[in-house]
Structure formats: C-alpha cells, structure tokens
Amino acid sequence: MEKGNYAFIDSQNLNLGTQKMGWKMDWRKFRIMLREKYNVTKAYMFIGHMPEFEDMYMQMHDLGFLVVLKPTQNLKPKVEKPDTKDSEPEEKKPIKGNIDADLVLWTMREIGNYDKAIIVSGDGDFYGLIEYLDEQKKLLHVMAPNWQYSSLLKPYENYIVRIDQLRRELAYFSRKKKQPVKK
C-alpha cells in the first residue's frame, strides 16, 4: 500500500514570500493542489502562535492542514512610557515564532509514515534537512515562495517548485461584490 506524501510548511516564509510578490495565497486552493497534484495526504503547517489568530488556525485546520503552533516572543524590550496625551503611539512589536526546529523534528519523526516529503520554504536553514531527505530518497520537492530562495538550496534546483509561478492557480481573490461606481 502506498503511504502518500507529506508536506511540511513554513507558513511565515510562504506567507511573506507571496505577499512580497504582491499577492495572497488561497489556502483552500493550495491544500487541494497539494493533494491532487502531489498526493499529499498530510500537510503540516508550522505557525508562531498568537492568541488573536485562533480563528485563522481553526480555518486552516478545517481546510485540511495539520496546524502545529509554536509559542512566540516579543522581540522589543518592554519600556515604561509616561501616560500623556502627547506621547507617541506605541510601535508594533515584532513577533518571532521560530518554527525551524519544529519543522525539522516533525519531518524526521514522521519519516517512516510517508513516501516522500515536500518542504515548503525557501529558507536555507533547512539545507541539512533537505540534504538528508535527498540522501534517503525521501525528498519530492522544495516549494519556494518565489525566485528569492536561499542560494544554499541551489544544489537542489531539480527539486525546486516556485510557488510564484503558480500564482494564477493559487491566488486569493476576494469574493465580496464590488459596489458599482456612481456617476
């Protein structure tokens, strides 16, 4: 019996990589494509956890992704500000939810359960994982969000699928009806 393939998705790399190219991913279309084109039976989505996005995590789960949440950290130190009307609004704090170790761990932990793996990231931090999967004949593809993937991945160009080249198939379009322009 064929095991099927698994996808391991660096959601931040994918999301930022497509947005940088001026579009948003339609996650439903992406999951369907993974299943139909690449026989992906399980798609693990690694995301830095932020409580205000609980609904999004549930939506991703409902679309067929196995959501793996990683605790996040605020990178800016807390600074007490005086409470005055003239004080500037607080800057948005950068949040870091480093999922790299989790993605590698889950890929290795599940290695006996899938035929081949798809790593969805253009991040060179996954070079060692990709190298190992290739040596074990377990690598199907590396799906990079755009042409700006890490030069460390160049030896694996034969495995690279650029998601930006699939924009027409995978882009999200708002389904809201546009209001007619009044003349």
Regions found by a protein language model. Name each.
Residues 1-183:
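Terminal and domain-boundary accessory regions
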